[in-house]
Amino acid sequence: YITLIQWWNKNATREGTHLYIGQDVARTMKADQLTRKMLYERSLSKVKGNCFWPANEILWNNKGVADSLKRNYHRYPALIPAYTHLHNRAPQEVKKLKTEWTAQGYMLHWQAEQSKTNPELASYFVIYRFENKEPVNLDDPSKIVAVTRETNYLLPYDDGKHKYRYVVTAV
């Protein structure tokens, strides 16, 4: 395992290459391996993440892997790293961001051109929530409340006593 990952890390030399390590949860994941694997992979410069399969093993929480991932490694949503070697411009910004009271609660709406294939246009949107006077920091994944392809989002409504600021980015 270590020899193979070191080889891939060394040989993934093309500029902008993203290296994701495949993990067969059912056949190769022993209970004590996850921590060692995750820490080692995160120490390598080219490794950008993991791909766990089969997906149902994660859904079934085989060997407690899903719990461990949520608790220790993936507490917050993650965005796919930008493929800047393919396209280095961000999609057009969202426009006309507004809230509206509906029968379901407060709904956040915005406008944006979308495309699954044109990188100039949004594929999906990331919604961040900040305390009213908190500085906006889009590098803080704990502030992500949703990732969606829709151009609206039902806001989580706590008790009406806290004011929040929402930011929507096009990705």
Language model feature labels by segment:
Residues 1, 5-86:
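Substrate-binding cleft of secreted/luminal carbohydrate-active enzymes
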Residues 155-171:
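Beta-strand-rich modules
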Residues 138-146:
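Local beta-strand/beta-hairpin segments that build beta-sheet-rich folds
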Residues 65-120, 160, 171:
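Pro/Thr/Ser/Gly-rich low-complexity, intrinsically disordered linker/stalk tracts
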Residues 47-52, 111, 115-120, 148:
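Catalytic domains of carbohydrate-active enzymes that cleave complex glycans
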Residues 28-30, 58-61, 105, 117, ...:
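Flexible loop/turn segments at secondary-structure boundaries
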Residues 113-139, 163:
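Solvent-exposed loop/turn segments flanking beta-strands in beta-repeat/beta-sandwich domains
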Residues 148-154:
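Short S/T/G- and acidic-enriched coil/turn segments that sit immediately N-terminal to beta-strands
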